[in-house]
């Protein structure tokens, strides 16, 4: 019997038959607010089945909307049932009722039923909150217009930090974007950045950008601007458009760099040409300070000269010049390094890491620049923050050819660093490196006997004697030099003097001496030094002989000896030009 009565109730509700409901209730009254098997009240079923008459009857006879698990007004909106919604509101349904973060207005927006949205908005709801984060991507132009018309805020970020404008940009809905932009439906600077990144970087759309540009506040965010993103993403069309509408290319982002910096970093010559006309070297030196150092590394010499046009008329700080120099060293381009040195950069100034330019050239293996720095007069005895000279660095890196070069330029082999260690002590155990260092030390001692009394020399010799392999090299050097000292070319002048001689006019006198052949055959440790001076003696002698003969028609009135003396004052290059 109870089952039949229950079935009759369901049929009456489904058929919206109030008379049957009334008869059933008069026969045996029941609790209208008691949930059924599916945890739903009779009113819930009536609302779900769009039974308007039954729902109104139930409400007038004590059914409470609060007894329903899901608010009836939300159910009616889900069903797009405007009539039911009006009935429920007439019996006190709250337009701001919320179920699991969902309000009637939010539900209406999700369904896209404009008539219900319009009706609910006429009831002055507080908004589609708290579940607004579920509807931004469901907005249509019509629903958005209604919300804006009724002053419903669309600039509150959802749980992902996005606003309605972001989702409109994501879908590429130009009409909706325009509506939101015109009504300032935008939030903080972070949201602006997300929107710009989406329409320029990740999902490029120039039409969206053009609409966003209607609100210049969106393009000119605090720090990173639309132009920064366009340049960084290499969107040439966007760059040209933004420049045409007057976007300021001199704005610095949160990293204190301008769009020009990113154009250089991307090596995009076309965009670089579009931007460069807006910049002056004064701006780059005083404001956009990271751009020129970057340009040292990425630009060609011609592009760099174009960027730096007029820089000589600007007073540059020593630190800034030093930064430019260190960046130019990394390029291994002597022309660029020469350009910076020509501006007055200190060739021996330490960088932020305490290194000197010569050491930076070794670190970055820029051999051409290393040689240029030496030619420009870099101090081979300058020390870094650890007290290491370039000789310490070269010895540790086994650069034996460069070791010979800096030793010839006067690098101090006995210099100590902050740890009290000399280049020989810091040297990597490489045969050629150790041999180069020890042979130089021994030849210094042979040239000047007083050096053996120097504490630093004593320290170096003591260190060498402490390692058998080093000691053997030292003994080999001493024996070879002693043999050279005993071989006299003339009275008071030995083969040793010939090997260490720097005056080419002197060694030219011995070009045909028979003992030079002996020197060439017997030299071992000092073979390179001996061969160099033997070759130079022949070269110098040949040039002098030819010069004397060449000048005879012009200086025939002078004795041969005088002409020879005059020619001796000329360098080899000058003699070759005669």
From Swiss-Prot:
ANK repeats: 4-34, 38-67, 68-97, 100-129, 160-189, 222-251, 255-287, 320-349, 353-382, 386-415, 419-449
InterPro entries: Ankyrin_rpt, Ankyrin_rpt-contain_sf, PRANC_domain
UniProt keyword RNA-binding, yes or no: no
Pfam family membership, one: PRANC
Signal peptide boundaries: none
Keywords for the protein's UniProt record, in alphabetical order: ANK repeat, Repeat
Residues forming coiled coils: none
Protein name: Putative ankyrin repeat protein FPV022
Species lineage: Viruses, Varidnaviria, Bamfordvirae, Nucleocytoviricota, Pokkesviricetes
